[in-house]
Amino acid sequence: MMSLKPDWVEYSNEEIEDLIVKLYREGNSTSKIGIILRDQHGIPSVKAVTGLKITQILEKHEMKPEYPEDLMNLIRKAVNIRDHLKEHPKDLHTRRGLQIVESKIRRLVRYYVREGVLPEGWRYDPQKAALLVK
């Protein structure tokens, strides 16, 4: 794939990959890595410069996260809402919010199973999700 590297980007593809691996080892998420590269290193888009997405670069270096970041964020949010509902069982607005978040999780899981990111038959279970997040 041809990459349209801006003239003012001073990093080579190998240097960008090394930066991504270093930032991931420091505990940064893929989205945070993109923000750091944009704001501190002047790399507007990793895909535009290298031709690969951040997750593809991590996969190439065998550092791919077990679950996609967006799914983990939604699961974390659902676990926090469940904890809130244990203390405030009559909070109906939050209960509705939990239904919406869990619906998003199920739709995203369906997509990731279809795309082969998650194994066939992977299901969202709130009890297992709490263990997964912690």
From Swiss-Prot:
<comment type="subunit">
    <text>Part of the 30S ribosomal subunit.</text>
</comment>
<dbReference type="GO" id="GO:0003735">
    <property type="term" value="F:structural constituent of ribosome"/>
</dbReference>
<dbReference type="InterPro" id="IPR000589">
    <property type="entry name" value="Ribosomal_uS15"/>
</dbReference>
<dbReference type="Pfam" id="PF08069">
    <property type="entry name" value="Ribosomal_S13_N"/>
</dbReference>
<dbReference type="InterPro" id="IPR009068">
    <property type="entry name" value="uS15_NS1_RNA-bd_sf"/>
</dbReference>
<dbReference type="InterPro" id="IPR023029">
    <property type="entry name" value="Ribosomal_uS15_arc_euk"/>
</dbReference>
<dbReference type="GO" id="GO:0006412">
    <property type="term" value="P:translation"/>
</dbReference>
<dbReference type="InterPro" id="IPR012606">
    <property type="entry name" value="Ribosomal_uS15_N"/>
</dbReference>
<dbReference type="Pfam" id="PF00312">
    <property type="entry name" value="Ribosomal_S15"/>
</dbReference>
<dbReference type="GO" id="GO:0022627">
    <property type="term" value="C:cytosolic small ribosomal subunit"/>
</dbReference>
<keyword id="KW-0689">Ribosomal protein</keyword>
<dbReference type="GO" id="GO:0070181">
    <property type="term" value="F:small ribosomal subunit rRNA binding"/>
</dbReference>
<keyword id="KW-0687">Ribonucleoprotein</keyword>
<protein>
    <recommendedName>
        <fullName>Small ribosomal subunit protein uS15</fullName>
    </recommendedName>
</protein>
<comment type="similarity">
    <text>Belongs to the universal ribosomal protein uS15 family.</text>
</comment>
